[in-house]
């Protein structure tokens, strides 16, 4: 209720429509305040990062994009790094392979959001706390298998 009241006051004072501003309520309304009083433009964080590192230019020479996340689930579709990477790469026609610690229910939603495939590095059905110490070995094993799959699909070994 407090943020709504503040938003209404800011809208009256500035004449700007802020109540429907995507991302305006994040960080206690900081985004809306910056738009209202400083004329700022809000952007998704992943878009700012990908633009800064020249992601679109790098895609022009890429055969694949690999991305990762500790746990991929339905929430991963809504604004997480992996969904931003998948959307940009898919728009450029570059397949995206996600390598994750845990592919939880809902992870399949990213397959409709630009992701080509998802591989979990966990080789045993154990809680994270028990397999944490094996993550480096499991990641190497998963990446070796993915590389072999790509090589086999291309007709080489």
Predicted regions and their residues:
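N-terminal loops that bind phosphate or other acidic moieties
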Residues: 1-157
